[in-house]
Amino acid sequence: ATTTPLSPSASESGSYFNPRVLLVDDNAINLKLLVVFAKRQNLRYEEATNGLEAFEIYKSEAKENSNSSPPTRPFDFVLMDLSMPVMDGLTSTRHIRQFESKMGLESCHIVALTGLASAQDQRDAQEAGVDTYLVKPVKFADIKKVFGGT
């Protein structure tokens, strides 16, 4: 996993929103594109190449933050591919949601990035705890909207 702190970006109100984002994709090119997006948006991010690694990073980062009161979620957003080896994105999402519940953490916003476009796939993702469902190829503008950008 790679951590890259970047400078916060100012919102129009003058306040700073500097979200932490977990980028998850087993495809090196797709992951690199997500990193480019994160850098352009001045996001603080971590990378994972499968759902298990993503869940382990999420847990590890949460435990580092466990001294805060109330406990804070380790990431504001997770951009999660769904079709990955070791552990798929839906299983990882379920584990993250269970962990958040167990630890009393505020839920992060999980965005599915997938080539699976059927209505059933979208229902399965929603039931697993996915907040936003984007079908590949995904444009940077679509991801930016999730972060509140235009």
Regions found by a protein language model. Name each.
Residues A1-T150:
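C-terminal compact regulatory domains
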